[in-house]
């Protein structure tokens, strides 16, 4: 190539880049000038992954509530600190004296968790559901020769030191609902259940509580529900403090004649796991027990040495991260946060996890001035993070060969998967944009990567708080803005 040709090529490249930058700035101006956003707080950043050049921005340093986009900060750090091949384990242990000749144990059987959020999951691919995993555990105990246990089946979730499992500063309204499930050292069935409600035929009548799936031992429900018009959907809420056996259900469900199911969070999954293992041993192998199941925190017995009978392993962390970001699973993100804290400082708490995550990104050159992280999932409304924080973290990921492949594959594809499946149809973003969404009342955010027509990759983050339009309207406006990043 001649010198003149090289100069011409460079000139054309710069011209195309400037044109794209001008078009994006125009789209940002249109978005930020929208009448529905005149009272809103907005932060937008678009950065070149390779060079670190800020392509376009609007209030890039303004910290806002980003909702579930926080999961990207947690999962990226988890892949870096724990590594993509990390697996969680769950152990069957026993203490006391075991007579192999008689099959009698004068001691307890322990279901010792190490934070696996997928244990007994009904939704994680490649994982046995709760009934299946309890069968595996019961079979292992039986094959080890235990037939009579003069003690208890004990659930042990002490791998994490945050006993009640919930995130820092979560709202009361969220705690009993499935997305507010706490993260424990021992989890089961993704720590949620279905509450079955018998619908009533007339407006104002009280639906009847028809049980739970799975059965929740010792949990009672105070029913404050009423029946609303057909088509009103699920407007019920379950209020359950962690480790409490009393729940309040209020709100409305539609009139009808069938069973209406709503999802709630288990108040004590550690005890629930122990209970179901004990029931499985009784029904499948006629194992006898002297005492009922228990949570280790309620045991009040001397701590004795234990021996391990059997170990169950989770899928690789890369697969768990993929489901976390594709389906926005709060429990998985919160478990990762506590595990990071445990691995880095032997303290499995949200605070320790947050400090470890911050230190991880600081070590990679990310400026965290004004960065306030309260949990791992984004459920806390007190998270305050700017779009510049997000793109700086994404750029660090994009230039880290150990993290990037698994992380990028975990992001929803525009128009195809996860929370972006029903967006971007027929636009240039399909096949070129991947992003994690975040939403709560009056909050919307999208953070991810966009591939340019010339193959360059941009990372972006858009956060909007306190818009005045509907959820579908703000989603449409944000979609138009993100499409412009791919044109």
Identify the meaning behind each predicted range:
Residues 1-24:
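Bacterial Sec-dependent N-terminal signal peptides
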Residues 20-62, 89, 137-143, 487:
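Beta-lactamase-like hydrolase cores
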Residues 31, 81-367, 484:
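Conserved serine DD-peptidase/penicillin-binding transpeptidase domain
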Residues 55-57, 141, 327, 334-487:
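Small-residue-rich helix-loop
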Residues 59-64, 263, 377-380:
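A short glycine/serine-rich beta->alpha loop
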């Amino acid at each position: 190539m001649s010198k003149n040709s090289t100069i011409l090529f460079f000139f054309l490249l710069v011209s195309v880049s400037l044109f794209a930058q001008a078009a994006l700035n125009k789209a940002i101006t249109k978005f930020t000038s929208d009448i529905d956003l005149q009272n809103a707080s907005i932060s937008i950043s678009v950065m070149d992954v390779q060079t670190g050049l800020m392509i376009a921005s609007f209030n890039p340093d303004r910290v806002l509530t980003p909702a579930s986009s926080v999961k990207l900060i947690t999962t990226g750090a988890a892949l870096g600190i724990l590594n993509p091949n990390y697996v969680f384990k769950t152990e069957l242990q026993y203490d006391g004296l075991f007579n192999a000749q008689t099959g009698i144990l004068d001691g307890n059987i322990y279901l010792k968790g190490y934070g696996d959020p997928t244990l007994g999951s009904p939704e994680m691919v490649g994982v046995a559901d709760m009934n299946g995993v309890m069968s595996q555990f019961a079979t292992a105990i039986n094959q080890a020769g235990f037939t009579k246990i003069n003690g208890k089946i004990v659930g042990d979730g002490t791998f994490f030191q945050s006993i009640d499992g919930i995130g820092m500063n979560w709202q009361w309204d969220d705690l009993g609902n499935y997305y507010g499930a706490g993260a424990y050292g021992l989890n089961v069935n993704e720590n949620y259940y279905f509450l079955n409600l018998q619908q009533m035929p007339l407006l104002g009548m009280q639906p009847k509580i028809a049980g739970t799936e799975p059965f929740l031992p010792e949990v009672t429900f105070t029913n404050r529900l009423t029946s609303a018009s057909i088509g009103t959907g699920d407007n019920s809420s379950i209020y359950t403090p962690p480790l409490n056996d009393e729940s309040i259900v209020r709100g409305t469900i539609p009139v009808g004649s069938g069973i209406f199911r709503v999802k709630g969070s288990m108040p004590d999954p550690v005890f629930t796991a122990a209970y179901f293992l004990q029931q499985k041993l009784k029904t499948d192998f006629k194992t006898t027990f002297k005492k009922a199941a228990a949570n280790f925190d309620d045991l009040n017995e001397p701590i004795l040495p234990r021996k391990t009978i059997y170990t169950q392993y989770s899928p690789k962390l890369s697969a768990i991260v993929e489901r976390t970001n594709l389906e926005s699973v709060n429990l998985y993100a919160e478990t990762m946060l506590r595990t990071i804290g445990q691995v880095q400082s032997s303290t499995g708490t949200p605070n320790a996890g947050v400090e470890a995550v911050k230190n991880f990104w600081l070590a990679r050159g990310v400026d965290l001035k004004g960065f306030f992280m309260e949990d791992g999932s984004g459920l806390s409304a007190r998270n305050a993070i700017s779009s510049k924080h997000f793109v700086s973290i994404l750029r660090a990921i994009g230039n880290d060969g150990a993290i990037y492949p698994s992380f990028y594959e975990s992001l929803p594809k525009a128009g195809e998967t996860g929370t972006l499946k029903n967006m971007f149809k027929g636009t240039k973003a399909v096949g070129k944009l991947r992003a994690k969404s975040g939403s709560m009342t009056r909050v919307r955010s999208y953070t991810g990567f966009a591939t340019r027509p010339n193959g360059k990759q941009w990372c972006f983050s858009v956060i909007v708080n306190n818009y005045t339009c509907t959820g579908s309207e703000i989603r449409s406006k944000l979609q138009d803005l993100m499409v412009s990043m791919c044109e």
